[in-house]
Amino acid sequence: MPREVPLERIRNIGIIAHIDAGKTTTTERILFYTGRTYKLGEVHEGTAVMDWMEQERERGITITAAATTAEWTVEGTPYRINIIDTPGHVDFTAEVERSLRVLDGGVVVFDAVAGVEPQSETVWRQADKYHVPRICFVNKMDRIGANFMRTVDMIRERLGAKPVPVQFPIGAEDRFRGIVDLITNKAVIYVDDQGKREELEAIPADVADEVERLRNEMIEAIAETDDELTLLYLEGEELSVEELRRALRKATIQGKLVPVLCGAALRNKGVQRLLDAVVYYLPSPVDIPPVRGTRPGQIAGDDGVEMITRPTSEDAPFTGLVFKIVSDPFVGKLAYFRVYSGKLETGSYVLNSTRNQRERIGRLLQMHANHREEIKEVYAGDIAAMVGPKQSYTGDTICDPNDPIVLESIRFPEPVIQLAIEPKTKADQDKLAVALGKLAEEDPTFRVFTDPETGQTIIAGMGELHLEVIVDRMRREYKVEANQGKPQVAYRESITVPADVDSKFVRQSGGKGQYGHVKLQVEPLERGKGFEFVNGIVGGVIPREYIPAVEAGVKEAMASGVIAGYPVVDIKVTLYDGSYHEVDSSEMAFKIAASMGLKEAVRKGRPILLEPVMKVEIVTPEDFLGAVLGDINSRRGHVEGMEARGNAQVIRAYVPLASMFGYTTDLRSATQGRATSSMEFAYYQPLPDALAKEIIEKRRG
């Protein structure tokens, strides 16, 4: 069966934004216009198609990235748009990270009243990291206080982007009734509520001057990115609509310009034009560089390791990346994956090259937020889901067994907040482990472990809301009732000076003994670098087959530090010497020797406790500014900057997480409910001695 839609006519896009900018509503409208849903879903009524988990419908926020396929016709040509709806709440950054990794382009939605909000900056930086070309949609133009040009200026100033308005609103707030398309230079007026009927009119006199100025600026910005157009422009030639679109498409894909559109998704205004813009300006899988990877067992960046590329074509060997695991009540485990090259049929085998496991492809599904369609094969550029994978997890590469490749995995931030959880009854005990296991499979930023000292089950995540949603899902989906402790800060340990150790594990008293001997150098890394292991063994003083055991022993010892039993981070461990015994050496012996060695090195390395620091943004009316600033200082925070936004003040500060529990409630009562705040993890920093002492005493009881 040949592919239905040629590659050039596929768009893989994500709709990304700050919470409440109207992202899910925009996606709903897209599904409505592309004929995938016949009744409009409303987030505030709790019927949105994309928000299919119960908690999402209740909270009116999006938690999981649902992937949906839609069709859209532009100028008589049908296109396929695969849409990934992503959450905008900071606690769910992992969802955004993994979506961006497999997208080709993004639609960033802004609220015309609030403009660029803190989470918009985070998402924008994430998109920069993966070089995702994007277009902007300034939504909620019908709300009181909506201001299109202010939002465009904020995109320029706060995000450091080069926004180019390709539309201009006619009217704002309740008088918002249409847009001027600056590319074609025509006014589009919406006649009915559904936004399905449009009429072209002459450009209204009250916006004519502004439109002319913006159109000239737009043409100049587009012409600057293309030498041929620059010449025509300088010679005073009129550039055609096709020339402008072609050059703007190229500049958008290269990340030089960002087209900006506007509308009001809830009123169905501007969404069809947004779909047209997705087709005109965002890349197809063919427009982006081919993916690169290494052969299994090799590490990118090591000496002598050559990178393999996979062109986006069906004739190349099959390569895909799993970007999301979901436990589905009807079909069990689903793995969403993006196909980068080749094609895949049901019934065939693939190699999971990340884990070196074969996986049989039973059924393939194409997803429409919560209704699914069975398909027989998928091709390069597609996004699909496979049913019941045995071995595959988020970030794994799946590929042709005869031509293996490992793509770069997806890196997720470490959890910063944890709480103890215990089942209410004996019956819940067994179900708890199953539920937590499945939830951890789905969400890489959610961790479950047992506290070695108290024996309690600890769950850790990115924020209070994140853990709240997890506990909620346990109750609803897995029917597990559990009591939860107070949220605790996830401290870490590290070292401040390098340390050298010589560690031996020897048991030789008759029969087969044990012998492992390693010399390790352990050095501090800069904050946020995690862990690095270097094998510096030369001349075979330790045989190669024991090296992985040494690394495993080091990692095991890092799980619980020497000061207060918190995980050890930001260290580089070099195995530079050691010895072995022909008969008595084993993997186990080397693992134990390495484990003991690391503990000793951390003791020698002047260990310290690290605490997570949050980046906090507070929007408060002027009258409460003094009180809010005083409060931040009392929480050991430091203010980084302030700016006026409308008649409110925006404070940006860094505050340790330990002093931020319940902050939203305190802030509300201090400001009569008029201030709002948002926070996200920023970095780990050393804990002041007096506080460290307190924590150590508490842990040691």
Curated annotation (Swiss-Prot):
Belongs to the TRAFAC class translation factor GTPase superfamily. Classic translation factor GTPase family. EF-G/EF-2 subfamily. GTP binds at residues 17-24, 85-89, 139-142. Residues 8-286 form the tr-type G domain. GO terms for cellular component: cytoplasm. Keywords: Cytoplasm, Elongation factor, GTP-binding, Nucleotide-binding, Protein biosynthesis. Catalyzes the GTP-dependent ribosomal translocation step during translation elongation. During this step, the ribosome changes from the pre-translocational (PRE) to the post-translocational (POST) state as the newly formed A-site-bound peptidyl-tRNA and P-site-bound deacylated tRNA move to the P and E sites, respectively. Catalyzes the coordinated movement of the two tRNA molecules, the mRNA and conformational changes in the ribosome. The keyword Protein biosynthesis applies. HAMAP family: EF_G_EF_2_B. InterPro entries: EF-G-like_DII, EFG_II, EFG_III, EFG_III/V, EFG_IV, EFG_V, EFG_V-like, G_TR_CS. One of its GO terms (biological process) is ribosome disassembly. This is Elongation factor G. SUPFAM superfamilies: EF-G C-terminal domain-like, P-loop containing nucleoside triphosphate hydrolases, Ribosomal protein S5 domain 2-like, Translation proteins. Pfam families: EF-G_D2, EFG_C, EFG_III, EFG_IV, GTP_EFTU. Transmembrane segments: none annotated. The keyword GTP-binding applies. It comes from the Bacteria. It is found in: Cytoplasm. GO terms for molecular function: GTP binding; GTPase activity; translation elongation factor activity.
